[in-house]
Every structure is written in C-alpha cells, then in structure tokens.
C-alpha cells in the first residue's frame, strides 16, 4: 500500500475520537454560556428581552439624533465664521458677497433639515406640515416681476365707498390666492401709478375709468394673470394696454426695440387694427415700437417691423404663419393678451392659439390675460391650461358669463315676408336718416358676402351715402370703408359678421339685421355694436319664416333682457334647437373634460 493511502487510513480511523471530543467541548462551552447569561439576567428580573431590545433601539436613535444635531451645529457655526470673515474683508453691499452668504445659508439650512429629517414620526409630520404650508408661496405668480403700490388716497377711502362702487357696477372679483379683501379698484385716473403726462393724455376726455378698467388695473399692474368677462364696448382694450406699456417702460433700455416683449392676439383684422391704434397712443410716449400683423397684405414689411417691435398686435392665423417660418420670435414675450377669446375659439383658432402661447415663456414666467364677452366651457379649459391662479373679474349682472344681450339696447323684432325685406329696410333708413338724424350712423348686417354687395348697391341707388365691409373686399377697401363710417362721411355701413364683434365704432345709433344670423350668439354680437360706452342703443331685426329654427333661442334672449316678444315670433315656437358640433353634428355631447370620469364595472 502506498504511503499516502496509509496516512489517509490512519486519519480516518481517528475520526470517531476527534468527533466525540469536539462534541463534548461544544457542549461544555454551551453550558458555560447559558450559566453566564443566567447569572446576568437574575439581577434584572423585571425587564423582558423585548424591553431590552426597545431600549437599545431608542438609545441608538438618540445617539444618531445627537450626532446629526452636532453636525448641523458645526455647519451653522462654520457658516457664521464665513459670513463674519466675509464682512471683515469686503463691504456688505457687495453683490458677490451677498450671493455667497445666501448660498452658505441655504447650505446650512439644507444640512439642518437633513439632520432632523429622521428623528421620528412626530418630527416628520411637523416637517411635512411646514412644507405644505409654504407651498402656496412657491406657486405665487411671478410673471413679469412688476410691483404695484396702492395710492395712499385710495387706501384712505372708507370700505363702504369701495363696496358701493363694486355693487353699483355689478363687479364680481374672484381671487383664488386670497380669501380676504382683494386689491381696491382704481375709481379715479389719479390713482394710476403713472407719472408720465404723455401716458395720461389718452384719458383727458374721460371722467373716470370704466368698471373693467378700474377693477383689472390693480391686479394687472401687480403682475397677476387676469380673466376679464365683460360686454363688448366696455373699455377692455385700455384695460390691458395701460399695464402693458407700464411693464415695457420698466424694462432696461438695452432691451427696448430688440424684439417682441408683449403680444396681443385678436380674432379679426379690424379688431387687431383697432387695438393697435389704442396701444400706439400710449406706446409712442414711452419710445416703444408697436406693429400690427394680419393677413391680406404682404408679409415682408411685417417681418421687418417684427425685428424691432416691442409690442405685437396680431390675428392668430398670420402670426402662426410667421412663427412657423421663423420670422416671429416670441420667446421673450412675457406679456400675453388673448382679446375676445371666446370669439377666437368660435372661429376655430384654438389650435393656432395654443401654438402661439407655447412659443412664449413657460407658465409662471409670463403674464397671461384673457378678455371675453362670454364664459363657455371651451374658454374655461383654455384658461386652466395657460394661466396661473388667474383673478376672474366679471362685469355686469351676469357673473357666470352666459350669453346675454346688453340691457341698454332696445330690441325690436319684425316678422316679415322674405320678398318684403328690402322694402322694409328702405322705410327704416328713411325714418332714421332724415332731418336732424341724417348723419346718425346706421349699421346694416347681412348674412352672405354677395347679399351684402347687393344690398349696398340697392341703398346707394336710393341716394344714401353707404359703404361696405365684407370678406370679398381687399384689406385696403375694408379699412377705407371703416374709416369713412367712423368719421361720419358715410353714415350707413353694410357688413357681414366679420364686423360684428369687437369693433369700437362710436355713436352707432341703430343696428338693422337685414338677415338673421346663423346663431343667436352672432345676433347678440351684432346688436352689441350699439349701446356702447354706457349709451343707449336700438336694434331692429327683420325675421322671416326661413329663420324659424332660431325663434326659440331669440325669444329667450329677448325675455332675458326684458324686451317685448311679438306674437308673430311666438307662432314659430319656443323650442331651442340643439347646437350641432362642426365635426360630429347633432350626435355630439359637450361634456366637462375637467371632471374625473366615473369608472363603470360590468359583471
């Protein structure tokens, strides 16, 4: 047998003896250990193993807490020493030193919070509570960084006088960031924080601000997002123009004339030009450049003007085209206005509006304003998407913003045969364009462009001074007609619905609906051309059997405004036809998409 095998055999033969001895030694060690632990446990018979374990955990937790507190104290002490040495070395007014101090303080505070983060459930709950309490401050709109200080004379007015002003003008202010008293309305032009006489010049012919101006100015001057719900002709243009120019004037001079810093979007060319004319009056006094961008004219001149323009007033279609071509940069436009927002959505510009706003600074870094005559669900969704805690200001006895005609307008509806409309139209023109009334402005609405052209020619043949404005005319012709009507050279204007919304035509005495519009909303917007700026107005509508589908909705508008309803109109019925969707027809249900859907489970 080889030697290696023999050695292995000898080792194997001794395995039993080694195993027995090792077992015996382990048993002896175990007995000694149990005896020792028994001796230790005997003096503390009251404590249980669970209690000992809890006490040891609490001791470890306490040690960790003390250790972290010590680290936090050391960090704070180190920060204080750095601040002290910084004060001795450099003057306190140094911006660099202030930045270093702020950074060090932030670092120390972070270390302290980290040290106290895991002390226990109670401390953790308190920390969470403090964070939740501080959250609203972090979402407070910063927008332009503008500040507003209330005039001392305004602050000194008794609250009863402010309440009386709000009640008299039916002003409803809803501020999601404040449950207490809101900013006081500027009841006088003297309360405006504007010292430049040139900027005050446009108000010299007015006694006091309109309700929408008085209520909106404080919030806009403070940099808040604002939703203004007010009837047409309430002075909304100046409501957003004054804060816009004041914000632009506060910018450093090296940022002026370097590209758009503010943008105003309007639904039609005429309304855009009208807003532009009002803003220019204020902008020129501050050395600001303003440009109006709309379709129907060459782009080259508009593109050149955009390079140095500070304020852009535009229609959504043309502005979106220029953005897509890379000719309009709105990345620095921190003041965004959507004028007549409901009208733009009605005209199908929602996609263009969203694209335009997405090219401006992000939410919270811009100030967004939305002015509208009504407050439908589509406008609410747009506001919820692009605005930060907006203040809603509603003017009038219709705070919900439902469709309602101006109560100062006398509405008369005449049911006539279709073939008799032109004859009756001529009778009305002779009645209201004679004697001392021969220069009174009369606005005649038609439904179609060809109809407007025919009616315009018919009125001109009868010897009346008349002009037309509709889609078939060039922009130059439309502008010339509108200016002639405003100046009074042609007191009669024949128009389609393109001029039915937002146009500020002063002193329109009478609106005649030669043909009823397709919707009752357009009817309200048409008659809204008269009775503006607190004045009374008259609207006469020629209603035929072809329009009977709108009779129910028209009757509701008349009743809501306490206007008489002729018996001939009631014969057509009071049923309100359901509005059909443009794409889905009558099978479309308009639902509130902001509400959470209800889950339905089927067995």
Curated annotation (Swiss-Prot):
The entry's keywords: ATP-binding, Coiled coil, Helicase, Hydrolase, Nucleotide-binding, Nucleus, Ribosome biogenesis, RNA-binding, rRNA processing
Compositionally skewed regions (Basic residues) per UniProt: 21-33
Domain Helicase C-terminal intervals: 424-573
UniProt-recorded Gene Ontology molecular function terms: ATP binding; ATP hydrolysis activity; RNA binding; RNA helicase activity
Residues that bind ATP: 230-237
GO BP field: endonucleolytic cleavage in ITS1 upstream of 5.8S rRNA from tricistronic rRNA transcript (SSU-rRNA, 5.8S rRNA, LSU-rRNA)
Family in the record: Belongs to the DEAD box helicase family. DDX5/DBP2 subfamily.
Annotated protein name in UniProt: ATP-dependent RNA helicase dbp3
Chain's gene name: dbp3
């Amino acid at each position: 047998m080889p030697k290696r095998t023999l050695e292995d055999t000898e080792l194997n033969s001794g395995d039993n003896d080694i195993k027995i001895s090792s077992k015996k030694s382990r048993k002896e060690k175990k007995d000694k250990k149990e005896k020792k632990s028994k001796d230790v446990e005997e003096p503390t018979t009251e404590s249980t193993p669970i209690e000992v374990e809890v006490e040891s955990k609490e001791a470890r937790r306490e040690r960790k807490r003390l250790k972290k507190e010590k680290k936090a104290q050391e960090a704070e002490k180190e920060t204080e020493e750095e601040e002290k040495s910084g004060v001795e070395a450099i003057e306190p007014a140094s911006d660099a030193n202030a930045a270093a101090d702020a950074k060090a303080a932030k670092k120390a505070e972070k270390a302290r919070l980290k040290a106290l983060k895991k002390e226990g459930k109670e401390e953790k709950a308190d920390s969470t509570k403090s964070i939740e309490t501080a959250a609203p401050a972090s979402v407070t709109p910063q927008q332009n960084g503008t500040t507003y200080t209330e005039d001392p004379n305004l602050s000194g007015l008794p609250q009863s006088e402010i309440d009386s002003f709000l009640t008299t003008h039916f002003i409803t202010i809803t501020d999601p960031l404040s449950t207490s008293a809101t900013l006081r309305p500027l009841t006088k032009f003297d309360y405006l924080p504007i010292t430049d006489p040139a900027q005050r010049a446009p108000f010299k012919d007015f006694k006091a601000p309109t309700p929408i101006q008085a209520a909106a100015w404080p919030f806009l001057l403070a940099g808040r997002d604002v939703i203004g719900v007010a009837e047409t002709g309430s002075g909304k243009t100046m409501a957003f123009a004054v804060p816009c120019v004041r914000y632009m004037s506060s910018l450093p001079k090296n940022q002026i004339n370097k590209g758009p810093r503010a943008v105003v979007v309007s639904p039609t060319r005429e309304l855009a030009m009208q807003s532009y004319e009002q803003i220019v009056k204020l902008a020129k006094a501050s050395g600001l450049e303003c440009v109006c961008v709309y379709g129907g004219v060459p782009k080259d001149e508009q593109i050149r003007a955009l390079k140095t323009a500070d304020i852009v007033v535009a229609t959504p279609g043309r502005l979106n085209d220029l953005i897509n071509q890379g000719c309009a940069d709105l990345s620095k436009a921190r003041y965004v206005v959507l004028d007549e927002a409901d009208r733009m959505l009605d005209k199908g510009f929602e996609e263009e509006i969203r694209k335009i706003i997405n090219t401006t600074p992000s939410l919270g870094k811009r100030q967004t304003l939305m002015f509208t005559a009504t407050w439908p669900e589509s406008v609410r969704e747009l506001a919820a998407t692009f605005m930060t805690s907006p203040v809603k200001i509603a003017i009038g006895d219709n705070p919900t913003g439902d469709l309602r005609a101006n109560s100062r307008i006398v509405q008369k509806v005449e049911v006539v045969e279709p073939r008799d409309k032109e004859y009756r139209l001529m009778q009305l023109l002779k009645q209201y364009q004679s004697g001392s009334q021969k220069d009174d402005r009369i606005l005649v609405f038609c439904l179609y462009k060809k109809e407007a052209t025919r009616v315009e020619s018919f009125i001109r043949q009868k010897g009346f001074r008349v002009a037309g404005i509709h889609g078939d005319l060039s922009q130059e012709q439309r502008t010339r007609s509108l200016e002639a009507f405003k100046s009074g050279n042609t007191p009669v204007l024949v128009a389609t619905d393109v001029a039915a919304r937002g146009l500020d035509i002063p002193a329109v005495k009478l609106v005649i609906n030669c043909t009823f519009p397709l919707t009752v909303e357009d009817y309200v917007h048409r008659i809204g051309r008269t009775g503006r700026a607190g004045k009374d107005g008259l609207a006469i509508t020629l209603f035929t059997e072809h329009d009977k589908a709108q009779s129910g909705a028209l009757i509701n508008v008349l009743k809501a405004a306490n206007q008489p309803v002729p018996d001939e109109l009631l014969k057509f019925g009071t049923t309100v036809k359901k509005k059909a969707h443009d794409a889905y027809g009558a099978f479309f249900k308009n639902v509130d998409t902001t509400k959470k859907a209800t889950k339905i489970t089927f067995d």
